[in-house]
UniProtKB/Swiss-Prot annotation:
Top enzyme category: transferase
Name used for this protein in its record: Phosphatidylglycerol--prolipoprotein diacylglyceryl transferase
Family: Belongs to the Lgt family.
GO biological process, one term: lipoprotein biosynthetic process
Record pathway: Protein modification; lipoprotein biosynthesis (diacylglyceryl transfer)
Protein's UniProt keywords contain Transferase: yes
Keyword Transferase: yes
Organism of provenance: Helicobacter pylori (strain P12)
Swiss-Prot/TrEMBL keywords: Cell inner membrane, Cell membrane, Membrane, Transferase, Transmembrane, Transmembrane helix
E.C. numbers: 2.5.1.145
GO cellular component terms given for this protein: plasma membrane
Task performed by this protein: Catalyzes the transfer of the diacylglyceryl group from phosphatidylglycerol to the sulfhydryl group of the N-terminal cysteine of a prolipoprotein, the first step in the formation of mature lipoproteins.
Topological relation to the membrane, as annotated: Multi-pass membrane protein
Length: 284
């Protein structure tokens, strides 16, 4: 047993308190994720204006729409997919975003679905671009290249919040014994950090490679979608399935099943981008 194995005994998920309001590391990490994604996108606009012909004010307005879509989609997606008492929230819709418990204590909003956030993001992007759909793929590409590094902070936040824990490390796994984290007296994979690396860093490198070697609008979001789906599918083998969900056919988790659907959506965007690529190039 090394110091890393027992790191959860060394810190509190609560960063600090403001009166009765407890500020968690996850909240701070999520705020960092938004800031990183925002400024990464601005840097891309300034560095490559031909690929991203968008004014800063225009992007700022779009970013608000996208972030709102992500938050709404992530929360509603969690309720519909993962929440055992989803029927209660569907009849008490206002409770979905209620950050207070029944005693009036601030507890924050727990339970967000990445894939739900993706759906919300796509819907928000379409609604914002519906008057000028020629820019839709440009917006999507911009988010595709700015989101992965922000995503890293989100998964680090999950790690600091001691949630979305990994599967139990087999006793014969030498590497697992080194990197594992003790959770409830069981050594588990640090799946949140594995996801941060695979779904954040590796996917970012994939999208940057695509940016260098492609010229068609819409391909960056396709590479992001396919790359994330693959990395998430792999990472799920180290992540403990949600207790209320378990596994399904072929022992696949819900995250893996949703990632397969994400592949289908990505291929659909690829068809749309291919069909409209000539028009987009002419309008540059």
């Amino acid at each position: 047993m090394n110091a890393w194995n027992t790191i959860y005994d060394q810190f509190n998920p609560i960063a600090f308190s403001l009166g009765s309001i407890e500020v968690h590391w996850y909240g701070l990490a999520y705020a960092c994720a938004i800031v990183v994604a925002f400024y990464m996108a601005l840097r891309m606009i300034q560095k490559d204006p031909k690929r991203f012909p968008i004014e800063r004010k225009e992007f700022e307005s779009y970013f608000l729409w996208a972030e709102l879509g992500i938050v709404l989609g992530a929360r509603v997606g969690y309720i519909l997919i993962y929440e055992p008492n989803s029927s209660y929230y569907l009849t008490h819709f206002w409770q979905i975003f209620n950050p207070f418990d029944s005693h009036g204590n601030f507890v924050g909003i727990r339970g967000m679905s990445y894939h739900g956030g993706l759906v919300g993001f796509l819907i928000a992007s379409y609604l914002y671009s519906r008057k000028d759909l020629k820019k839709l793929l440009i917006y999507l590409d911009l988010i595709a290249i700015s989101l992965p590094l922000g995503y890293v902070f989100g998964r680090i936040g999950n790690f600091l919040n001691q949630e979305l824990v990994g599967r139990i490390v087999p006793k014969d796994s030498h590497l697992g014994q080194i990197i594992g984290i003790m959770v409830d007296h069981q050594l588990r994979y640090p799946s949140q950090l594995i996801e941060a690396f695979l779904e954040g860093v590796i996917v970012f490198l994939m999208v940057m490679w695509a940016k260098k070697h492609t010229k068609t609008h819409g391909l960056l979001i396709v590479v992001y979608g396919l790359g994330y789906s693959l990395m998430r599918f792999i990472a799920e083998f180290y992540r403990e399935p949600d207790s209320q969900m378990g596994v399904y056919f072929l022992n696949l988790s819900m995250g893996q099943i949703l990632s397969l659907f994400m592949v289908i959506v990505s291929l659909g965007i690829l068809l749309y981008a291919t069909k409209n690529s000539k028009k987009i190039k002419e309008n540059q």
